[in-house]
Every structure is written in C-alpha cells, then in structure tokens.
Amino acid sequence: MRSASPKDSQSATASNDSKLDLEITEARNDSHPGMASMLRPGTNTGGVITSEEYMTEDEKKVQDLKDFGYHKFRWSSLWQPAEINPLNGKSYTFPIFRMTDAYSTAFWLATIGFFVAFLSWFAFSPLMPEAVKADLKLTNPQVTHANMASLGGTAIVRLIAGPACDRFGPRKVMAALLILGAIPSGLAALVTSAGGLYAVRFFISILGATFVTCQAWCSTFYDKSVVGTANAFSGGWGNMGGGVTIAAMIGLFERYRAAGYSPHLSWRLCFPTMPVPCLLLVAGMILLFGKDHPAGKWSQRHQFSGTAVAIAQGEKIELDASERAEYERRAADREKGPAKAANFRAADPADAGKRVATVDTAQSEPITFKRLLVILADPRVWMCIMCYLLTFGLETAMDAALPGLLFTLFQSNTFSAIDAAYAASLYGLLNLYARPLGGVVSDLLFSKYGLRGRVIWLLVTAFSQGIAMIGLGVYCNRDPQFSGVMWFIFLIGTTGFLANGANYGIPAIICPSAIGTVSGLVGAGGNVGGLLYLGIFLAKPGVKKAKTLGTKFWIAGVVNSGAVLPFFALLIPGKFSVL
C-alpha cells in the first residue's frame, strides 16, 4: 500500500479547512440557528473554540467589541430579521416592527401580558376615593390596608414566579398568572366588606408577578448588548397599564352611571367587563402564538452551541427531567448532543486567554439551594434589589397616594376627585418614555464602560429620585401651586422610571443562568418597597391646614437617597469592588 505523501496530507488538510469554513459560514448566516448538532463535533464556533485563522484583523476588532457588549445600531434593524448570536440564539438587534419574527413576537406578548396584568392589578385604585370607599363605608386606614394587601401578595408570588420561570419557562408562567389573576378580578364584584376587599386585592396581586415573567422572557430572547433596551421598553410600556387603568376604569364607571346604574352597581360591573376579558384574551394569545425559547421548546434551550462551549470550558450544566428526556430522544436519532462533553474538544492552550463569557453561553437552569446562596452572597444582586425597592416601591405607593394628595391640596368646584385621578395618571404615563430611555442609556454605557457603566447610571438615577422627593415634600409644606406640584411629580417619575429601566439590564449579566430567580428577588424587593413607603405615608398622613401634607414625601426622599449611597462603594477600585 502506498504511504501518504506530504502533498496528499496538505491537500486533505486544506479540504478539511474548507469544510469547516463552510459549516461556520452557514451557521452564522442562519437567520434561525438550529441546534449545536448542526456543526460537526469539535467545529470552531466562537470564543475559546474559535480559531483566529478564520478571521481578519478587522473582524477580530469587531468581534472583540461585540464580546464586550457593543453592536452597532441601525434603524433598519427595527424591521429587518433579527441578527442572532449563534452561541445562545439571542438577538443582537431589536426587531420590534417585524411582527412575524419570533423575537418580535416574544417582546410584544411579554409587553401586552404585563400591560393587562398591571391594568387589572391597579384597577381598584382609581375607583377607591369616590366609589368603593363610599359604598363599603371604609375609613382612610382601611383604604391604606387594602393597598398594602395588594402589594404583599405580589411580593410572595414574585419570589415563587422567578424559580418557576427558570424551571418551566416564562411563557407558561405568564399565561398561568394571567388566568389565575382573572378569577379574583371577576370576584371583585361580590365584595361587601373591608375584609372581603383585603382578600380580593391580595389575590388580584398575583398579577404583579408578571413583571418577573416579562423580564425573564425578554432576557431569554435578547443578547447582553440590547437586553437593557428590550427589558426597559417591555417593562415601561407594560407598566403603563397602571396609568391607563385610571382613565379606563373611571371612564367605564362614568358610562355605567350615565346609563342609569347606581354607584353601588357601577363600580362592580367594571371588573367583569374590562379586566377579566383582557386577561383571558391575552393569556390565550400567549399560549397560542408565543414561543418558549429561541430554540423552540423550553426543554430544548441547551441545544445551542453555547452549551457545548460551556462544557468545553469546564462549566457544569444542570439538566432537568424534561431536558434529559429530550436528549435521550435525540440521541436515539443521532449521536450528536451538546450534553455530551466528550463530543467537544478541549480549548487550545493558545486560546486560553479568550474564554467565552458565561453570559454568552448560559441558559436558565432550575435553581438549587446552593446556587441560591451564591446569588444572595452577591452584593450586585442586593444593589439591584435595593434600587428597585426604592424606585418601583415608590411608584406603587405614589399611584395610590397622588390622587388623594392632589384632591386635598386643590379641591374646588372646578377640581373634583375625578380630576385629581386623571392628573395623577400622568405620573404612570411617564413610563412611555422614561423606562425605555433608562434601558437605552444603560446599553450605550455598557458598550463603552461595561457593567460599571450600567451600575453608575442606576445609582445616579435612583439617588436623584430621592432628591426630587425631598423637593416635593418641602414644596407641599409651603404654599404649593398645581403647576409646581406637577413639575415635581414629573421629576420624581422621570428619575425613578429611568432607574427602573437602568435596573433591567443588570440581572441578565450578573446571573445569566438564573435570570428568573434574580428577577423574582428584584421584583419582590419592589413590593417590599411599596409597603415601606405606604407605611411612611400611613404614619405621617399630614394635614393641609397645618402644612404637613408634604412631610411624608420628604421623609421618604431622605430614606431613598440614604439607602442608595452605600452602594456607590461598589464602584471604588480595590478589595471591596465587585465590578
């Protein structure tokens, strides 16, 4: 037998290189990347597995920028097909106007689900001052207790919804929350006492946990370079449901009154005719048109090549029962699965310094007690929790307090309780631009300064909200004018909602394999913050004649700013820095 000549060996090597080039090109150009098994085991796909001989110097520079979180924005990316990270299937771009794209569909369903949930969750607030309070003969403390019940329930459910998202996927969890929340929303019409009101509002607050599913769903579909923008737009526009419900529920109540129904019956008819149908309709849309993950089913989420890269880098991948069953089924068809580390070669020593970041390879995994302890030991997680506690917590408290404040300060023949509620609704509508802007700026800073940029932006905006609250409190204790109060409300809303948007881009980076769990912790913090602020408002209600109505606001502002300050220490280089 003739031995292989050096020329034959070189020819075979060149042929193999050509095949590898073709496989990599096809994978990168695939608008809907498939599973890792598309590539031959050991094929270079990126990061530690990538061989630099396939990239020019310019391509390497661009790739380095992308690895750091930069992806050049183009207006056309809003309607063109999503550009996909082949490692994890997430989109580098934000194609919200390409409705047939799975990434756009996930964004809009998450947003609409969040919107109708908040519309229903806050549906009692606009009817409370005039209709519900009078009909049930409630005292002011009872109204406050009802508001606190609606916040406490959400905090509990958010802690449960987070791990559920990591285990079952955010799509299924969101649909379940909407369906469950529709039940007490319909039963609201049967309330006849303060105790019944507390119970109904507690169970309606299940809907507040959709914040967790919204964030987890968007984080599942969008890459680190754009996740802040995607989450902020979804969170901001979805949260507007809390502002829209004021106009919607009051308008519906007035329609029933004009049709001849009594106030006793009018407010009760509002719940089964608006929130309930909206919740059930959107839940059906999510189940019919939604997608669990870019890979398809939630049990298929580890089938992107990033899992293979993570295994090659020595990371341990936890598979749940449904995933193991999926891999066993696929293994029967072909012996190519990312769960088998032996199929993937180890990294070359020369590439050891270019390990792929965990944020690019991680997929959500069921939470364990050990991993939970690791998460709770991370000061960056507590920073996110505290900032959301202070910002979203204030939002929920202000949604309940502002109508009463404006009515008490400016009540007249031309300014009724309904007028005060409409004016207060402008606070929630600031979410239209402020939260999205907070996320966009966060992504821009991340592209230039990394996680440090995101954190600075979050801390500055959260601290500024506290300063604005102090200003409102001092102003209301003097001789306030309507325009002046509204300007302070604008400042408080803008700074607070910017901080919310800034917060949304951080959990997916610091804990990429437990996005749901961290989002649940952060979201629960927001509800605890609402209880904190409502407690301050209840302890210091204030009196108009004594010019003490603003005291509770400046106290809340001092608490806000003081609680943010310690986290600036995370930015100091040295032993205690975590950035």
Regions found by a protein language model. Give the residues of each.
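Symmetry-related core transmembrane helices of the 12-TM Major Facilitator Superfamily/SLC fold
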Residues: 265-287, 550-570
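Conserved MFS/SLC helix-loop-helix module at the cytosolic interface between two early adjacent transmembrane helices
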Residues: 156-195
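Cytoplasmic helix-loop-helix junction between adjacent transmembrane helices
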Residues: 200-239
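Extracytoplasmic gate region of multi-pass secondary transporters
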Residues: 124-126, 373-438, 500
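Cytosolic juxtamembrane N-terminal segment immediately preceding the first transmembrane helix
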Residues: 2, 8, 12, 16-119, ...
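Extracytoplasmic
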Residues: 105-140, 245-253, 396-403
